[in-house]
Each structure stands twice: as structure tokens, then as C-alpha cells.
Amino acid sequence: MNYDIFAVGNVSDDTLSLLTVTSMETAVDAGNAQVQIVHAASMAPTVDIYVTAPDTDITTEQPLVTAEFTDATDLIQVPAGDYQIRITPAGETTVVYDSGTVNLADGADLLIAATNNVGTGDSPVTLLAADGDGSFKIWDAEAGAAIRVVHGLSLIHI
């Protein structure tokens, strides 16, 4: 049995709590990737999560999952390959998060959590992916970059 623990909620409004997500230890079938999805974004509503081939029109697709805050899926196996992860408010097709193309490698075993976006861009969430050895963020493809320029030399004028 695997146990993953998230701190969710917000310190400022006293909603901070622990969320324990469990899963059975399951081998990934050859040619597949395995994911477990967690809605850990306290400031996001109930959402539909689409995991499709890149550039697929989601208006003709069913979401992989509909999730409200603190929901977690079971382990889901999908064929290894390139995907696009898009999140919409539940029942709508207006995309509020778009991963762009993401490769789910053969044998990958990922826990992917939607977390509150504290970076750039308008998306309410970013995705945090963990594979047991480390973690990385999957930013919204439309987020852009934040740049801060500091002039710290007093003898040089710009």
C-alpha cells in the first residue's frame, strides 16, 4: 500500500489540513504509463480533467475524470505516448488549464496533483507530478514566464 500525504487548504483562513491519498502497489503493464490524479487545489471548483491526444477537440470527448477538491482517482493505466491534459470547470468546455504536449513514458508511474497556482498566468492550477524519485511542475502552456530585473550597482547608470 502506498500513502501520499498533501497539505491542502489555506493557512490564512484556517482551512489547512492533511489529505492522505492511498493506492495499492501495482506494476505498470508493458507499453503503458500509470497515473493517479488528485484534486489538491483548494481555490479551484469541481473540474473535468481531459487527458487526450494533443490538439484533440474536447467538445467531442468525455472527461477522464470529474473531481472536486480532495478527490483522488484510483491508479489509471494509459498507453505510453504524448498527451495533452486540459482542465475545465465541471460540465463546461472552457479550458482553464492546458499542459500542452506531455509525454507519459513507457513504465512511468506518476502521482499528478492539481495544486493552487501561485506562479504566473491566469490558470487557477498548476500540476505537480511525482514519480517516487522526485517531483516536477507541469505549468499551464499559456502561463509565460515571470522576469524581474534588478539594477544593484550604484556606480553604473542605466
Name the predicted role of every residue range.
Residues 1-156:
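Intrinsically disordered, low-complexity polar regions and short flexible loop motifs
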